[in-house]
């Protein structure tokens, strides 16, 4: 192998220039850094990086090529009370690596030591980084750039969406290749969604506890290498290009790709977790630590990345630019996004949030925050700056309570229906900022929401202690999927009422993949470790009628001007009128204490009839000739200026023009 040259400090990671590879690694406290390269026989060669520019250690290896397997050993003080945990016996991954060879297994040699160094060498068992080339023919690929006011998001897991689809070739099911297959593209376009939000596709690791009980981290939130495309979701050997092929196919169909990304914690977990990367490279720069060097745990995952540190912030920004520029993704959903604004308290003016919104290379990206973590002051719904949108748990909970429990007022329902203006408008945000959702990957599916009163998570191996107990669900009289015809009909009506509310609310709707098909997880509301038929969509048993209903709702949404406007609904602007059952404006007492019966007139022509009460009701319609709008059942049309609505039902009428 050629002799190492000085190289350069940027960019971080391993960069192939056609003639060799430049390596650059950040570590402020290290005293010695070794580049470790491995041949086909796992033989290790160590090369000291003698060049240092500021806190960047670097070197250039002439003649090195893509495919080279490598890692680092970093030496320095081991003083846990000072936050220093250097251990040269541990082979470390490059935080900027683009590809991983192998898997992180549960092995004692990966432990770095709690109070003193663990001197067992980890190189033999440790996964290795791989040098990559990033050339790719994007042809004429363009970002769809769907305006927020026209966006409908579909949250899905790559494998869960495609693994059991009978019309996708068996050898690619569950992969990026399946995601980009014409069968899947046709399904998504026929449904009418505009953006596919993928659960993490960053390279993740399975937690030791899960490995010990024979489970896997299915969701992928235990991220190991945020720059690397997860190999476990690839059908072939080239995960990066397979993923890019899928993005290109989705773009060609006008569908945006939004990635769920994890920058709040790492796969190194708590102090008893493995030393794989940041802990051994520069522990006190990468992590939030207490006065005695202990890890803060505002994420519930054992550690918290210190995203206000300049070097760590730069690392995150470089990662976002990689996914935007190299992989052409259209946006990001940030898991536990309060961590992004911690300094350590949350502020909307945090350096990382400011960098994201002002970065020219990220212009046009959709940015979505999950606005909470479990630390002090962690709940920050409505507090993120423009241009962020935010997952609204208030929408989820209030709409569930309205339809399934009847314990919130018409006023609360209307506030959520109107893009939660009470939360977002006061901060000069626009309606799109409210990501309206009924369900998501964490929690009950929609079918389970109307079939189970209690979680059933025993398969997760935690004695049913995991997962929330606050579901606001309603099994309609019988626990579980099996029920008599009357209960099935009431469950179906509840699903349709909830879905209608979701799709026709102002704001940005997000649909969980499978909800339109009647998918159940058998009452498991925390299926993060169930990479099996519990979570995979069963296409052969799909509720086709419900799917057609949802597609019709999305098409209906596109025709209603009030749901396409970018500004807030204002009294007198013609966008919305709120009427009682008699067709008159609601009185203050009716808003807060009235029956759960409401007429919502949108753009003067579409009438959403809401009967969430427990008994049928007759609605006196506004003046005009009204007909049932598709996709609603035309067997119950209005007659004589009245509409007779069943209990806990919803319908949309359209005024006929001359």
Swiss-Prot record:
Residues of the site described as Transition state stabilizer: 442
Keyword tags: Carbohydrate metabolism, Glycogen metabolism, Glycosidase, Hydrolase
Record has Transferase as a keyword: no
Active site, UniProt feature: 335 (nucleophile), 370 (proton donor)
E.C. no: 3.2.1.196
InterPro entries listed in its UniProt record: GlgX_C, GlgX_Isoamylase_N_E_set, Glyco_hydro_13_cat_dom, Glyco_hydro_13_N, Glyco_hydro_b, Glycogen_debranch_bac, Glycogen_debranch_GlgX, Glycoside_hydrolase_SF
UniProt cross-references to SUPFAM superfamilies, sorted A to Z: (Trans)glycosidases, E set domains, Glycosyl hydrolase domain
Region (Disordered), start-end ranges: 457-481
Catalysed conversion reaction: Hydrolysis of (1->6)-alpha-D-glucosidic linkages to branches with degrees of polymerization of three or four glucose residues in limit dextrin
Associated pathway: Glycan degradation; glycogen degradation
Gene3D superfamilies listed in its UniProt record: Glycosidases, Golgi alpha-mannosidase II, Immunoglobulins
Compositionally biased spans, kind Basic and acidic residues: 457-468
Signal peptide range: none
Highest taxon of the lineage: Bacteria
GO biological process assignments: glycogen catabolic process
GO molecular function: glycogen debranching enzyme activity; hydrolase activity, hydrolyzing O-glycosyl compounds
Family the entry assigns: Belongs to the glycosyl hydrolase 13 family.
Role: Removes maltotriose and maltotetraose chains that are attached by 1,6-alpha-linkage to the limit dextrin main chain, generating a debranched limit dextrin.
Protein name: Glycogen debranching enzyme
Organism this protein belongs to: Pectobacterium atrosepticum (strain SCRI 1043 / ATCC BAA-672) (Erwinia carotovora subsp. atroseptica)
Chain's gene name: glgX
